[in-house]
Amino acid sequence: MQTFLATSDLTRADLNQLIESALRFKQGNDQSKPLAGRSIALVFFNPSLRTRASMQIGVYELGGNAVMLEPGATSWTLEHRAGAVMDADKTEHVAEFVRVLGRYCVAIGVRTFAALKNWEEERTDPILNSFAKYSDVPIINLESAMHHPCQAMADMMTIREKLGEGRKKVLLTWAWHPKPLPMAVPNSFALASAQIGHDLVIAHPPGYELDGELMGKIRQQAEEAGGTVNVVNEIDQAFDNIEVVYAKSWGSRSFYGAPEKDIAVRAPHRGKWMVDEQKMSRTNSAIFMHCLPVRRNVIVTDGVIDSTASVVIDEAENRLHVQKAILAKLLKQ
């Protein structure tokens, strides 16, 4: 494992090994310090609570030092485009930035959200891939325009921890939100669920389909792992007999770069596409999951997120353990 950009870079066996390693860290059965005397650069283009805190603490618990950098705030503004004429507001090119960090650090984590402006460009993850292009040390994706693999691995770990091994009936449901959001979390949750072999239902209103190429990969991974994928446009029946409910909002590709149009189209779905007690009652005693932060009584009711079915805090904690497993695998001496 030389880098960690998406779960699809790894095999099903690799993913299960990471989960098992993360469980050992959580249970206190792995006290190794593979980062002793070593530093990791963590580059954040965007705000963060769970990713930033869990990565910084995880590096420390593995014996290492985390160097926090925020381009445009605690470091220079960055240009990533090849051949760019840098006569505007960008001070340094990723080519130098990354290679200099590689002389100081043994790995670089990068968080760079979708700007929600140009779908065809952003779906290629240009900033993340420019880091990977120029780096001589491993790159860890801490959320990009298309993928959030660390979150997805914490999600898979949480499902295993709460429900045991084996194939589960998993629902990824779109939820109403006052503005369009990036697709990285739903993309990665769906992809990892398929790789593990779960029976995946994706529920969303018409017009909120995930990327077609990615869906092809999700279906292929599910077939190889013995799982299934079913996409539905009605919310209530989607909950029937489900064991895991994962709620997340995302924007429409049809209105990418035009948020006011997306907001108008999604308006009728307010309330109906919220996880509530009535929908959860249709499930097979399902656990409720969300990556956080979550808007209460918009995405999910207080009654659900505060219930014993909710595992969102455990899910957030597991970010720490699974990222330690990722770091240990990447950087084992």
State what each model feature region is.
Residues 120-141, 257-283, 308-309:
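A short, gly/pro- and small-residue-rich
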